[in-house]
Amino acid sequence: MEKKVFVVEGYAKKGSLKFRFKKYFIALKKEDAIFYTYSILGSNHKLKKTQIHIERVYELDPEKDKDKLPDKRLLAFF
């Protein structure tokens, strides 16, 4: 299988606060990127899965969308 760059966008609620997030992951499939999102936000911000709302998951092509990647070191995986 081939590794792909996925972008996960959404928002999370913690108490009365609501914050938006955009995470970039290298994963084999879309479901893995969603799982990593829950894992990272849960451990770093102490959020439950029900507090995290994923709005959009899409794949970036590292060759075409080089300017959209937040860190050029992601290209080292391809």
UniProtKB/Swiss-Prot annotation:
Cellular component (GO) terms are:
ribonucleoprotein complex; ribosome
**What is annotated about its quaternary structure and interactions?**
Part of the 50S ribosomal subunit. Binds 23S rRNA.
Q: Which domain of life is it from?
A: Archaea
Gene symbol? Answer: rpl18a
Which one of the record's GO molecular function terms can you name? Answer: large ribosomal subunit rRNA binding
Annotated family: Belongs to the eukaryotic ribosomal protein eL20 family.
Protein source organism: Nanoarchaeum equitans (strain Kin4-M)
| Gene Ontology BP terms | translation
Q: What is this protein called?
A: Large ribosomal subunit protein eL20
